């Protein structure tokens, strides 16, 4: 089985395709400058790196180009080999303290939180919909940057400003780069015992 991990940014799509039997990276790369005439598609596979420049008008086109390339290069024989898509999501607010399978409720909450990450959450949803359309049988999971920080005590995440800003407008510290913090903390445990 293969899983693809993606990070759909406002004008980019980063990806890694994993073979889950041994958790090895099969291919990785990035599509940059999406929406511009000189978009750049970089893919690394079997020790080689390919870089092409072309017009990639939106994330839907970027996702289709990526998936077509995976088949054309023989990286996958068929898109049905991809059993799941992991989507990095910047802002999960206080809703999510772990990764979740994406359903309609999750999509609605990611959309609701777009004001907290206006350059990121809308792009994540665009990427989600593009993959869902292209490989509808693959499961989809959202991995939230903010999830790692949800164990903070209220005294740590509430700003020293009038409390009504927290209750009325949800102004608080949500944390950032939690997936990296989680990895580093787990790695430290592994190394330090």
Q: What role is predicted for each listed range?
A:
Residues 3, 12-56:
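Short glycine-rich, Thr/Ser-proximal phosphate-binding strand/loop in the N-terminal lobe
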Residues 75-120, 148-156:
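Short beta-strand-loop/turn "lid" adjacent to the catalytic site in phosphate-handling enzymes
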Residues 3-5, 84-86, 141:
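Short glycine-aspartate micro-motif
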Residues 18-23, 98-108, 155-165, 191:
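A glycine- and small-aliphatic-rich helix-loop capping segment at beta-alpha/alpha-beta transitions
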Residues 69-83, 188-193:
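Phosphate/pyrophosphate-binding loops at sites that engage ATP/ADP/AMP, CoA/4′-phosphopantetheine
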Residues 125-129, 133-193:
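ATP-dependent carbohydrate kinase catalytic cores
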Residues 51-78:
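A structured beta-alpha segment of the ubiquitous adenosine-cofactor-binding alpha/beta core
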Residues 7, 31, 85, 145:
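Residue-level signal for inorganic ion chemistry
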């Amino acid at each position: 089985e293969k899983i693809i991990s993606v990070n759909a940014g406002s004008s980019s799509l980063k990806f890694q395709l994993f073979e889950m039997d041994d958790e090895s990276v099969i291919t990785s790369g990035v599509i940059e400058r999406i929406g511009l005439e000189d978009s750049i598609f970089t893919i690394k596979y079997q020790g080689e790196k390919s870089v092409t420049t072309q017009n990639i008008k939106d994330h839907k086109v970027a996702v289709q180009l990526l998936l077509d390339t995976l088949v054309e290069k023989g990286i996958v024989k068929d898109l049905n080999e991809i059993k799941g898509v992991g989507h990095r999501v910047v802002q999960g607010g206080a809703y999510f303290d772990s990764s979740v399978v994406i359903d309609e409720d999750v999509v609605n909450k990611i959309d609701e939180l777009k004001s907290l990450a206006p350059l990121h959450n809308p792009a994540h949803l665009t990427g989600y919909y593009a993959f869902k359309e292209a490989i509808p049988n693959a499961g989809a999971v959202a991995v939230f940057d903010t999830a790692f920080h949800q164990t903070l005590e209220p005294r740590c995440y509430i700003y020293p400003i009038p409390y009504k800003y927290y209750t009325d407008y949800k102004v608080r510290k949500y944390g950032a780069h939690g997936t990296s913090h989680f990895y580093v903390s787990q790695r430290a445990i592994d190394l330090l015992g």
